[in-house]
Curated annotation (Swiss-Prot):
Belongs to the class-I aminoacyl-tRNA synthetase family. MetG type 1 subfamily. GO terms for cellular component: cytosol. Keywords: Aminoacyl-tRNA synthetase, ATP-binding, Cytoplasm, Ligase, Metal-binding, Nucleotide-binding, Protein biosynthesis, RNA-binding, tRNA-binding, Zinc. Pfam families: Anticodon_1, tRNA-synt_1g, tRNA_bind. Is required not only for elongation of protein synthesis but also for the initiation of all mRNA translation through initiator tRNA(fMet) aminoacylation. Residues 604-710 form the tRNA-binding domain. A motif ('KMSKS' region) lies at residues 347-351. It catalyses: tRNA(Met) + L-methionine + ATP = L-methionyl-tRNA(Met) + AMP + diphosphate. Its EC number is 6.1.1.10. InterPro entries: aa-tRNA-synth_I_CS, Anticodon_Met, M/V/L/I-tRNA-synth_anticd-bd, Met-tRNA-synth_bsu_C, Met-tRNA_ligase_1, Met-tRNA_synth, Methionyl/Leucyl_tRNA_Synth, MetRS_core. The gene is metG. It comes from Paraburkholderia xenovorans (strain LB400). This is Methionine--tRNA ligase. Homodimer. Its cofactor is Zn(2+).
């Protein structure tokens, strides 16, 4: 079982904890974009919070380097895979450094440590009787003489007919399907028509009762209810045997680690990638003289946390803990999943190119800490998606960071330097306003540790409002006009600067570079949480004030959009059928009678992808009288967000847990409240005034999320 869960009580936890933290490993096949940065910023804030408590915390990461895409991209660029991943590593490290991501070690999964650890995990699982060899049939490129992953096969979508769609899903209509269903399939690598070929593969027996029983017990320790519910759904009820065995091998040619005793067979990237967490830490342990085994062996008292996107929850809450448990390692203390990022309501997609790169943020002159603050202001402990609204981004940064926070120092520092030699009034350090700020710091720290960053920052900005109200009431600019007000002016400026120090302490996990500049300005040691009760002193004068932060200029936003314009174009919607163009609507039927739609063919009907969906969450939409926001499980790795105009008929709690039917391939629609990714079906009378009522369709209880309605 996992180590004890984190103590999230207010204030610093008792005792010095040993904590290993990771973020998911970025793939060495492309640039870091701001969707990636949500996770790294979230993790970094948490790590900095724990370090400020004085705990022994190590934050490690690595590039995920293995797999067919890396091999093929290197070939396309005329490089060896090693040359490609070395170059991409430098680019990734540059971007992480620019955004203040404070890795203790940033490594590569293509390392000797990772090869040895991956082999050891595999051999331990084999010794435990959890590895099977089986023959499977796969798509094969007869020209390149290689087996093809689903994403390396393209063809015409079997649902809407769109050309050049991937072997597992259509990016025009949103349908999912098997590669064998593609029309006129071809290999992305050579253009040849794939053939079917049999090969021996190696499987991790996740369906073994030992794995199932372990995972049923382990799932109870997860911090996020959404993750627990999803895992229980994947596990099913006792006796259902819903877990499938996991193919952990790939055939040559492949860039990765060869499986011991299996020439020409390689570990699938999802086996050695998470082991890469340990490999990076082992590399750090060797450099720092740490006892690696004491941290990762079964029964270790150290804590281990993984921050991930909700799309890889399956790997991190099923395969990874089971791999660790049955290879003699400790299991994760917890796994924290976050939602996806949209930009002005549009989903980010690397495969579609709809993303803003981290480097473009730097090159267009935006302060990386602006983005750190904005993301933190939207992040909480759930798996909710978050939206980067660029107008809101500009307004929030300018209002909160410049107008409220930095403004406090700029209003007081000049007077303190000119009139009082930069020294605070010691008696002012006991002011009631400062007492209220100090009392709030432990709760702010606790909110950070609980990953409720939005709550921590909301509380911090409320305190900044109180400080600004104090300054507005005291009017130091008026006090300075009369020498008789010298004591009062000194108090006002001293209270303001100490309040600024406390606000800087509260913001330090989010704005580390700004906090460092503040520490230099105030001539103090690096701030930690315990410093809430260590005020400024007249014995230590502050330094001259220098401008700490500028406002976001609209021209910078324009430059950012221009730099990413090609990747921000909307994905085209499926074209209307030719025979539907130019037709007028049929005349309405007489009042009280149903309108009979035109006859359609079975081919027309087949274009609609109807799926069983489970409503896993439902809430009212603030500002709308008609809409409910539904979170739907459609049997995919991630949930879908749908807005439905059924608020008049249902309370949100009535719908949670119900099965329904949705149109899964409806083009996503940007709405005022967010992105709607489908449509839930409901019935109503033709004349709703005469016969009111909305009725969400419910399938028979035997239906499962993701099943197609045919």
């Amino acid at each position: 079982m996992s180590a004890p869960a984190t103590d999230l009580s207010a204030g610093a936890p008792s005792g010095r904890r040993q904590i290993l933290v990771t973020s998911a490993l970025p793939y060495a096949n492309g640039q870091i974009h701001i969707g990636h940065l949500v996770e790294y910023i979230q993790t970094d804030i948490w790590v900095r919070t724990l370090r400020m408590h004085g705990h022994e915390v190590y934050y490690v990461g690595a590039d995920d380097t293995h797999g067919t895409p890396v091999m093929l991209r290197a070939e396309k660029e005329g490089l060896t895979p090693k040359q490609l991943i070395d170059r991409v590593w430098q680019e990734h490290k540059r971007d992480f450094d620019s955004f203040g991501i404070s890795f203790d070690n940033y490594y590569s999964t293509d390392s000797e440590e990772n090869r040895v650890l991956s082999e050891n995990v595999y051999l331990a699982l084999k010794e435990a009787g959890l590895i099977d060899a089986r023959d499977i049939e796969q798509a094969y490129d007869p020209v390149k003489e290689m087996f093809l992953p689903d994403r390396f096969i393209k063809g015409e979508c079997p649902k809407c007919g769109a050309k050049d769609q991937y072997g597992d899903s259509c990016e025009v209509c949103g349908s999912t399907y098997l590669p064998t269903e593609l029309i006129n399939p071809y290999s992305v690598v050579s253009g040849a028509t794939p053939v079917r070929k049999t090969s021996t593969h190696y499987f991790f027996r996740l369906s073994d009762p030992r794995c199932e029983n372990f995972l049923r017990a382990w799932v109870g320790g997860l911090a996020q209810p959404e993750a627990t519910n999803k895992m229980r759904e994947w596990l099913g009820d006792a006796g259902e045997a819903k877990l499938a065995d996991w193919d952990i091998s790939r055939d040559a040619p492949y860039f990765g680690f060869e499986i011991p005793g299996a020439p020409g067979k390689y570990f699938y990237v999802w086996l050695d990638a998470p082991v890469g967490y340990y490999a990076s830490f082992k590399n750090l342990a060797e450099k720092r003289g740490l006892d690696f085994d004491a941290w990762v062996r079964k029964g270790s008292k150290a804590e281990q946390y993984h921050f991930i996107g909700k799309d890889i929850l399956y790997f991190h809450t099923l395969f990874w803990p089971a791999m660790l448990e049955f290879s003699g390692h400790r299991t994760p203390t917890n796994v924290f999943a976050h939602g996806f990022l949209t930009v002005d309501g549009a989903k980010m997609s690397k495969s579609r190119g709809t993303f803003i790169t981290a480097q473009s943020v730097i090159e267009t002159g935006l302060n990386p800490e602006w983005l750190r603050y904005y993301f933190a202001a939207k992040l909480n402990s759930t798996m909710e998606d978050l939206d980067l609204n660029l107008d809101d981004f500009q307004a929030r940064v300018n209002s909160d960071l410049v107008g409220k926070y930095v403004n406090i120092a700029s209003r007081a520092a000049g007077f303190l330097i000119k009139r009082f030699d930069g020294r605070v009034q010691d008696s002012a350090m006991q002011h009631p306003l400062l007492a209220s700020l100090r009392a709030a710091v432990p709760q702010i720290a606790a909110n950070y540790e609980a990953r409720e960053y939005n709550r921590a920052l909301r509380q911090t900005m409320e305190l900044a409002d109180a400080v600004n109200a104090y300054v507005d009431t005291a009017k130091p600019w008026d006090q300075a006009k009369d020498p008789a007000n010298g004591v009062a002016l000194h108090e006002t400026c001293s209270v303001s600067i100490e309040a600024f120090r406390l606000l800087s302490l509260a913001l330090k996990p989010v704005l580390p570079k700004l906090a460092e500049a503040v520490e230099g300005f105030l001539a103090i040691q690096p701030l930690v949480w315990a410093d809430a009760n260590v005020p400024l002193s007249s014995t230590r004068p502050i330094n001259a004030y220098k401008h700490l932060m500028t406002r976001v200029d609209p021209k910078q936003i324009e430059a950012l959009l221009a730099a990413n314009r090609d990747s921000l174009q909307a994905t085209p919607e499926a074209a209307a059928p030719a025979d539907a163009k130019g037709k007028s609507k049929a005349a309405k039927a007489a009042a009280g009678k149903d309108e009979t739609p035109g006859i359609i063919s079975i081919d027309d009907f087949a274009k609609i992808d109807l799926r069983i969906a489970k409503i896993v969450d439902c809430k009212a939409v603030e500002g709308s009288d008609k809409l409910l926001q539904l979170t739907l499980d459609v049997g995919e790795e991630k949930t879908r967000n749908v807005f439905s105009g059924i608020k008049s008929a249902y309370q949100p709690e009535q719908l949670v847990g119900k099965l329904t039917v949705m149109v899964a391939n409806l083009a996503p629609r940007k709405m005022k409240f967010g992105l709607s990714e489908g449509m839930v079906l409901a019935a109503s009378a033709t004349d709703e005034k005469a016969e009111p009522g909305l009725y969400v369709l419910e399938p028979d209880s035997g239906a499962k999320p993701g099943m197609r309605v045919k």
